[in-house]
Amino acid sequence: MGGENSAKEDPVPKITVLQNNQQTSQNSQQNVSNVIKQEKPNDDKRQLSKEEEIELDKQYNNLKKSKKIPIVYCSYINNDKTHWKIVFLGTSGTAYEGGYFQVELIFSDVFPKNGPEAKFITKMFHPNIAKNGHVCMDLLNKWNEKTTIENVFYGIIDILDNPVPENGYSNEAKKSLEEDYQKYQDIVEEYTAKYAMEGF
């Protein structure tokens, strides 16, 4: 798996891959276990109110049970319920096909009034994703208390497949997409092969 983790983690000997994804074979489950890390306990994690913990637990469990999002792994980072790591499969028939993409979600103390910060751990080439992995997406900027984390991943997958350069960053990916779409697609495929299939 490409990119750099924001938390220091040790190899995990065993991983439970979500069973609702029929594309995930036994071999790919083993491959995921080779690159997903086990987080260390974090004594500095924020103390949650009972209401915050209930809401985060609900969102987390609903995401793990989703049958529409191609998620193969979902876990807390450093055993912190406000810091999640999610791995999902790229959409078939796109430049992301075959890739395993890591995203982290960071929930501040104003959640659920404001949405989480979403960042790709996997290195990406995309006009709506900054060099540091930060995702620029309307849904995250126009959050309301009825929005779900499942909605967030619908949005993330949709924006990968359908970039919105006018709402993105002034970066190389935006320039490439606007000037030569095929060249842009070729670069995305290269990134997928180099950073999202590492170890597979």
Where would I find each of the regions flagged by the language model?
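UBC/E2-like fold recognition across ubiquitin and ubiquitin-like conjugation systems
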Residues: 1-100, 106-200
